[in-house]
Curated annotation (Swiss-Prot):
It comes from Methylococcus capsulatus (strain ATCC 33009 / NCIMB 11132 / Bath). The lineage of its organism: Bacteria, Pseudomonadati, Pseudomonadota, Gammaproteobacteria, Methylococcales. This is Protein-export protein SecB. SUPFAM superfamilies: SecB-like (SSF54611). It is found in: Cytoplasm. Belongs to the SecB family.
Length: 155
């Protein structure tokens, strides 16, 4: 069997996991600690991929949580959890799900832990983030991109 017919060996490895950016703000403290704890929570999530070199990618997961009491911001947490991943030998159609779903799924527990620690150290009740289905989010993004790419048809 010639080497030309062999597929490249698939390789996936975590090179480094790190906090790229973090912020915790309590703009209305200490007054906010006197209010009844009935929070309104806003949660935003995003991810970004950057190819560093052939087969080496940085994936970053951004989490922003704003908690309000009576329209006053109790706290705002922002974290960008990132990782550097070696990914090579995979077919092109598998790279999107790896970078858009699998890698963020690896990063999320670290971001969740950082959020929990920051909120606890800020003197607030625990903020426990539920697991996220990154496969479903990725598929939703793919479908939205496909819909936007299609020209509008008259009805």
């Amino acid at each position: 069997m010639s080497e030309e017919n062999q597929q490249p060996e698939r390789q996936f490895a975590i090179q480094k996991l790190y906090v790229k950016d973090v912020s915790f703000e309590t703009p209305n403290s200490p007054a906010v600690f006197t209010l009844k704890w009935e929070p309104k929570v806003e949660f935003n999530l995003g991810s970004k991929v950057q190819q560093l070199q052939e087969g080496l990618f940085e994936v970053s997961l951004s989490v922003t949580i704003t908690v309000k009491l009576e329209e006053k911001t109790a706290y705002l947490v922002e974290i960008c959890q990132a990782g550097i991943f070696t990914i090579s030998g995979f077919p092109e159609q598998e790279m999107g799900p790896l970078l858009g779903s699998y890698c963020p799924n690896i990063l999320f527990p670290y971001a969740r832990e950082a959020v929990s620690d920051l909120v606890n150290k800020g003197g607030f009740p625990p903020m426990l983030l539920a697991p996220i289905n990154f496969d479903a989010l990725y598929m939703q993004q793919v479908q939205m991109a496909q819909q936007q790419a299609q020209p509008a048809t008259p009805h």
